[in-house]
């Protein structure tokens, strides 16, 4: 039998960035690998847009669904296939974290509505506000009432799935963090981003001043990402055979 400690985290890459972005900073999995300091045995990369099969649930410890330059409302074949996989993964109680496109895809897969945000783009380092229910969330209770995170998106979750709990908002987006089950959540912001990644992702017609700011003090979004990763790991006592 495969040891739980050997199971990798699936990094589900949803489409590929523009060539100029890839040239500067690589593709989405690299950003998560660097943010979490993952070693080669810690993860596997799955690319549904290249026709790759999504992983069997008993072969992975959890999954992160990446951001994308695509739109959920385009209903691409690979996106719809990934949405069906999300529904099955939720039923299987697999730890899931959706980020930006992944956030919208999870909400859509579970019955929410995704569309262009009527309030327009969110870009750059922006303040978020957590709801009181966050303090009762086992994974997220350490987050402060307010923190800043990197954002870059035009579409949003306009209406969350009926069973989802909204845990954070921003000025332009009422669904910044959604909790679907004890194992599954999604975030509209980019916990894997740094100022360098944000700057590299800006299109030519957007001022570099969007990325002028930087996080001061604790990077709470990154801590959320790290906490999710640790959630997928076996307990230390189990790893030691206690």
Where on the chain are the PLM-derived regions?
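Cysteine-nucleophile active-site neighborhood
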Residues: 66-134
């Amino acid at each position: 039998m495969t040891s739980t400690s050997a199971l990798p985290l699936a990094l589900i890459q949803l489409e590929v960035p523009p060539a100029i972005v890839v040239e500067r900073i690589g593709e989405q999995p690299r950003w998560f690998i660097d943010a979490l300091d993952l070693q080669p045995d810690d993860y596997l990369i799955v690319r549904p847009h290249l026709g790759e099969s999504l992983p069997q649930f008993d072969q992975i410890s959890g999954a992160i669904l990446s951001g994308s330059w695509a739109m959920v409302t385009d209903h691409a074949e690979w996106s719809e296939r990934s949405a069906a996989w999300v529904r099955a993964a939720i039923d299987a109680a697999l730890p899931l974290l959706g980020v930006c496109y992944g956030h919208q895809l999870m909400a859509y897969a579970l019955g929410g509505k995704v569309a262009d945000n009527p309030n327009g783009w969110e870009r750059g380092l922006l303040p978020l506000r957590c709801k009181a229910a966050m303090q009762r969330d086992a994974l997220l209770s350490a987050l402060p009432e307010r923190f800043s995170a990197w954002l870059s998106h035009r579409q949003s979750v306009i209406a969350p799935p009926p069973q989802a709990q909204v845990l954070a908002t921003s000025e332009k987006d009422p669904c910044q963090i959604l909790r679907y089950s004890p194992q599954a959540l999604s975030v509209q912001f980019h916990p894997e981003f740094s100022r360098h990644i944000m700057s590299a992702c800006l299109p030519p017609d957007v001022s570099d001043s969007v990325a002028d700011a930087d996080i001061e003090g604790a990077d709470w979004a990154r801590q959320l990402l790290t906490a999710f990763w640790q959630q997928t790991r076996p307990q230390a006592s189990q790893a030691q055979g206690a």
